């Protein structure tokens, strides 16, 4: 079965979306800066994404089946680490049914809700786990907005 990526879970422009550092995402404004990672161990892993743009095996085999889903932003994708170390992969070890990682880098909560709705249409979702994102990330008129505008037009 062939699925059009735009018809199902994909969110427009997300696969190639490259967000900018914004307010609280900025390394200089985080609780620990880049200098704190000087001794962080280098890990050897590859980023592999399926045909739908998610960091997992292809999902076609699960269409209509009972699954759990994990939703969120780059923390769910586990950017910076092997997929086996993601919270979704760790959680999957406690279930007898597949647990799908539907994390998207730079996703806002409205994009997460959009993916949730589409996932419920094509899978028999049993449990949903969400790592909510920053509130300033928005999907406005089909475009992902990451920056906080001084006039608060994102809100």
What name fits each language-model region?
Residues 1-69, 122, 126, 131-155:
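N-terminal secretory targeting modules
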Residues 48-110, 114-118:
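Serine-esterase "nucleophile elbow" of acetyl-processing enzymes
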């Amino acid at each position: 079965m062939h699925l059009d990526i735009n018809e199902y879970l994909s969110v427009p422009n997300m696969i190639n979306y490259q967000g900018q550092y914004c307010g609280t995402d900025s390394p200089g404004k985080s609780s620990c800066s880049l200098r704190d990672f000087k001794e962080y161990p280098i890990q050897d892993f590859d980023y592999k994404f399926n045909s739908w743009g998610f960091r997992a095996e292809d999902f076609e085999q699960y269409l209509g089946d009972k699954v759990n889903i994990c939703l969120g932003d780059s923390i769910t994708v586990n950017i910076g680490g092997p997929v086996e170390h993601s919270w979704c992969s760790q959680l999957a070890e406690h279930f007898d049914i597949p647990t799908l990682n539907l994390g998207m880098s730079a996703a806002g909560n409205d994009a997460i809700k959009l993916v949730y709705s589409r996932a419920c249409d094509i899978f028999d979702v049993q449990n949903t786990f969400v790592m909510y994102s920053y509130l300033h990330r928005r999907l406005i008129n089909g475009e992902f907005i990451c920056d906080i505008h001084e006039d608060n037009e994102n809100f």
